[in-house]
Structures are given as C-alpha cells and as structure tokens.
C-alpha cells in the first residue's frame, strides 16, 4: 500500500504527490483524512483522473475538500471505488463510495465490485424485442417501452419527469416483482426522501436498492454515482440471472458534473462549455446498460432538457442510445393534461406491428394522424374560427380534443395532488378505448368526461355524473 501527500487543492480536484515507486492507476481510489467531514481517519475518497508526471497524480474528490491541507497523508488503496453488491444491498440507501446513508448500520455484503466495468461482449448480448407494460395509457399506446431496453424521459424544468419516474417505479416494480435499483444523480434530497418513504409504504423497498448522490454533493460524486448504481444492477443481472429495473434521475446531472470537473482537469471545453469527452463518457455508461443471455437491465432515465432546447449537446448525446423516448411538453402541461407527454414527438422502436400486433399499431398510428390533422387545423381556427371548418374537420377537432384529454391519467403517486385514486390501465383496455373514440362511438359525450380517467368505461361513468 503506497502513501503520498496532498500537493494542492483546487475545489473538488486534489493533486497528490507520491515519492518514488509506482503511481496509483487511473480510476483507482485513494483515501485521505478530512476533519471537516468527521473524526474518522482516511474518511475522504479521491479517484485518480490524470498522471501529471514527477510523481504527481490529479484526483477528483467524492466529498467536500474544505479543511484539506497541503502535506496531508494520502493512502493508495490499490483498487477502484467499490460498491456493496448482492441481496444485502436491497432495502438500503448507499452513497457513491458504497457507504450506507440510511442510518441502519453497515451493509454486510459478501462481495464488493469495482464501479468501472467493461460492457458485455456482442456475443453475450440478447436482442429479442418484447413490450414492457407500464399501465400508463399514453406510453403503452404511442411509445411502448422495451423489456431490457433503454428509455428516456425528456423534459424541461417542472413538467413532471420525477413524478412520471416515480409512477413507473410504482407500476412496474409492483407488477414486475423482480429487483430494482434507483440511482439519484444530482437531484433534490427532498425527492429522494419522498421516494424512500413512498417505497416503504408500498412494500417495494425490500426489493429495491437506492444509490444517492444529491445536488449538494461535489461534482466527483455526481459524476460517479450512476456507475455505482449500475454496478449494483449488473450484479443482479450477471450473478443472480435476474431481470433488473434500473431507474436514473437525472442523467443530465451526470453530464453536468462531468462538465464541472472537466475544466478543473485542464481540458479545453467543447460546444456550450461541455467536456470534450461527453460522447465517450455517455457511451461508457450506456453500453453497460444492456440485456445479456443471463438476464436483463431495463433502464428508465429522466433527462433534463436545459431551457427546453433539445439541440443542447447533453440531451442530444443521450438520444442516440435510447430505444424509446417519452417527451414531456410544457404546452401540454399548461393545458393541465398530465402526464404531459407529447403524443407526436415521443418515439419507440417497438412501435412495429410485428412486435405489438396489427391492432395496437393501427390504433396508435390513427391517433397520431388525427392529432396531427388537428394541429394543422389550429392555424385556420386561430384566424377564421371553428365555424369556417367543414363538418368532417369539426369532427376531427372534437375527437382530437377528447383523445388529448383521454391521454391524461390519474397517478397513484399524485393522489394527494389530484384527489383522485390512481389508475393502472391494461394495454387491451387502452387500445379498445382509443379505437372507440376514433370510430365515433362517444361523439355525444362531453370532453370533460375523458379528462383524468382510466378506461373508456370510467369516462362513460363520469359523463353520466356530469349530466346528472
């Protein structure tokens, strides 16, 4: 075990000098004492990022560096940052370096895995396409998720990404019955606490492992916590042969943390100030999230879109890795239609008749065609008004408005906001409901009857109450 000393501290970046002998490898962990964190010796973990020459390595800190002094003794561990893996990690909350943060004592895991791992080889990967039911109408109908696929929830600030990811955790984890891993990357501590309480109440916590590196953590922790979470998920896939759900909120913060550290490491920034290694870092993470012949990892990732600009390099780089995208739209949220999913810009490679069946495919395409026609008519309506439309176009507008409202749904995790019980809708009921609206069976019902209901039967019931 080699020892060195702190040479200089620049925010989250620490230079460490080793005299003679071997230098610790890139991505290996070092430990140093920081009295500001606690009185425990060697309580701060550093990760080697660069070799500068003359026995000096540049490292990124996983916790605060306030209180570190030059000349402080540093211990090279000779290993990477490791995470506790296996069933002992279920029901627990750990941080980026694998330490428990739920005040429930140590995680007595039999194994610790390094967080930097190689992606599965091509011959080990499984590629069969099957649909993952979410119980959310707009998702299942128009942009269905793939089992063992990668899904992105895109949206700007405050359009409902976290609520949607919490609903997906509740629906899929409860119905799915396998293991889940949640990585909280650079998001609000309050949301993490809410999620933990929610999971405890719903009984899902015993089959879930949570890994948190919240907004208040230094960029080093936020840039690595997704890898820690993924390592926990990989163990369940590779060793226990499980189908694992891996939730990440928010993948943008992973990129953001990398950008914060990049300049301090002396790299010249690329477009919009992001790190020049953006595509490489994203690829390294995303390529590990895949299905193998042993088991699968189905990943749902929330992606913050800065200033609602989808051409920003961070969301644009994420797009290329995904099987399905659920785009949350501010204009739809402004209409109070929740989940605020845009039915025309959300995509999925599973929207294919050979995978989801002819009936589902035809219904989804007909819904999109009707909504697109309605969108084209909006300009005419804005200038001339509804009265100038032909009878067939008036019918298009009327049915579109009903479909828009029927795409909304009361969520289980939002019951305290809506005052309505949550609804899980089976795909057969979803297709049946939208087909009936398209065929004009419910032209006589008021628009309001379709708002925040589950199945078409619920809408008919609501219409009776409204007319009573």
Swiss-Prot record:
One protein family per Pfam: ATP-synt_ab
Q: How does it sit in the membrane?
A: Peripheral membrane protein
Q: What is its EC number?
A: 7.1.2.2
Keyword Cell inner membrane attributed? yes
Q: Where is the signal peptide?
A: none
Q: Which GO terms describe its cellular component?
A: plasma membrane; proton-transporting ATP synthase complex
- What does the UniProt entry say about where the protein is found? Cell inner membrane
Q: What class of enzyme is it?
A: translocase
Report whether Transport shows up as a keyword of the record: yes
GO MF annotations in UniProt: ATP binding; ATP hydrolysis activity; proton-transporting ATP synthase activity, rotational mechanism
Q: Which residues bind ATP?
A: 155-162
- Name the catalysed reactions: ATP + H2O + 4 H(+)(in) = ADP + phosphate + 5 H(+)(out)
**What Gene3D superfamilies does the record tag this protein with?**
2.40.10.170, Bovine Mitochondrial F1-atpase, Atp Synthase Beta Chain, Chain D, domain 3, P-loop containing nucleotide triphosphate hydrolases
HAMAP family named in the record = ATP_synth_beta_bact
Its quaternary organisation is: F-type ATPases have 2 components, CF(1) - the catalytic core - and CF(0) - the membrane proton channel. CF(1) has five subunits: alpha(3), beta(3), gamma(1), delta(1), epsilon(1). CF(0) has three main subunits: a(1), b(2) and c(9-12). The alpha and beta chains form an alternating ring which encloses part of the gamma chain. CF(1) is attached to CF(0) by a central stalk formed by the gamma and epsilon chains, while a peripheral stalk is formed by the delta and b chains.
**Protein family according to the UniProt entry:** Belongs to the ATPase alpha/beta chains family.
The function of this protein is: Produces ATP from ADP in the presence of a proton gradient across the membrane. The catalytic sites are hosted primarily by the beta subunits.
NCBIfam families in UniProt: atpD (TIGR01039)
Q: What is this protein called?
A: ATP synthase subunit beta
Q: Which organism is it from?
A: Bdellovibrio bacteriovorus (strain ATCC 15356 / DSM 50701 / NCIMB 9529 / HD100)
> What are the top taxonomic ranks of the organism?
Bacteria, Pseudomonadati, Bdellovibrionota, Bdellovibrionia, Bdellovibrionales
Designated gene of the protein: atpD
């Amino acid at each position: 075990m080699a020892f060195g000393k702190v040479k200089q501290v620049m925010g989250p970046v620490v230079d460490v000098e080793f005299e003679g002998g071997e230098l610790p490898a890139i991505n290996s962990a070092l430990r140093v004492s920081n009295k500001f964190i606690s009185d425990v010796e060697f309580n701060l973990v550093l990760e080697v990022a660069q070799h500068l020459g003359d026995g000096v390595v540049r490292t990124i800190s996983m916790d605060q560096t306030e209180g570190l002094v030059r000349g402080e003794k540093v211990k090279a561990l000779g290993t990477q940052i490791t995470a506790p893996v296996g069933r002992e990690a279920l029901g627990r909350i750990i941080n980026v370096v694998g330490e428990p943060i739920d005040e429930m004592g140590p995680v007595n895991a039999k194994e610790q895995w390094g967080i930097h791992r190689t992606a599965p080889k091509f011959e080990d990967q499984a590629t069969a396409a099957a649909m993952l039911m979410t119980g959310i109408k707009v998702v299942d109908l128009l942009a269905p998720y793939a089992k063992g696929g990668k899904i992105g929830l895109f949206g700007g600030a405050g359009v409902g990404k976290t609520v949607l990811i919490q609903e997906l955790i509740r629906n899929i984890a409860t119905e799915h019955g396998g293991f889940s891993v949640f990585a909280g990357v650079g998001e609000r501590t309050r949301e993490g606490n809410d999620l933990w309480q929610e999971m405890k109440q719903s009984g899902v916590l015993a089959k879930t492992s949570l890994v948190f590196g919240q907004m208040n953590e230094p960029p080093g922790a936020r840039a690595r916590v997704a890898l820690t979470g993924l390592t926990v998920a990989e163990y369940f896939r590779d060793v226990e042969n499980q189908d694992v759900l891996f939730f990440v909120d928010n993948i943008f913060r992973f990129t953001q943390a990398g950008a914060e550290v990049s300049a301090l490491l002396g790299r010249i920034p690329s477009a919009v100030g992001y790190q020049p290694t953006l595509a490489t870092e994203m690829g390294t993470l995303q390529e590990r999230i895949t299905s193998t012949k042993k088991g699968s990892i189905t990943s749902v990732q929330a992606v913050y879109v800065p200033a609602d600009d989808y051409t920003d390099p961070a969301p644009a780089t994420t797009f290329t890795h995904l099987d399905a995208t659920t785009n949350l739209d501010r204009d739809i949220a402004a209409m109070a239609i929740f989940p605020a999913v845009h039915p025309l810009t959300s995509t999925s490679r599973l929207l294919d008749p050979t995978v989801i069946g002819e009936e589902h495919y035809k219904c989804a395409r007909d819904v999109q065609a009707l909504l697109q026609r309605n969108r084209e008519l909006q300009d005419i309506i804005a200038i001339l008004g509804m009265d100038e439309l032909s009878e067939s176009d008036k019918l298009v507008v009327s049915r579109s408005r009903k479909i828009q409202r029927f795409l909304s749904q009361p969520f289980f995790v939002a019951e305290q906001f809506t005052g309505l019980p949550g609804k899980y809708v089976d795909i057969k009921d979803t297709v049946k409901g939208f087909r009936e609206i398209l065929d004009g069976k419910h032209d006589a019902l008021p628009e309001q009857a379709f708002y925040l209901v589950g199945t078409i039967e619920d809408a008919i019931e609501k219409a009776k109450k409204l007319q009573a």
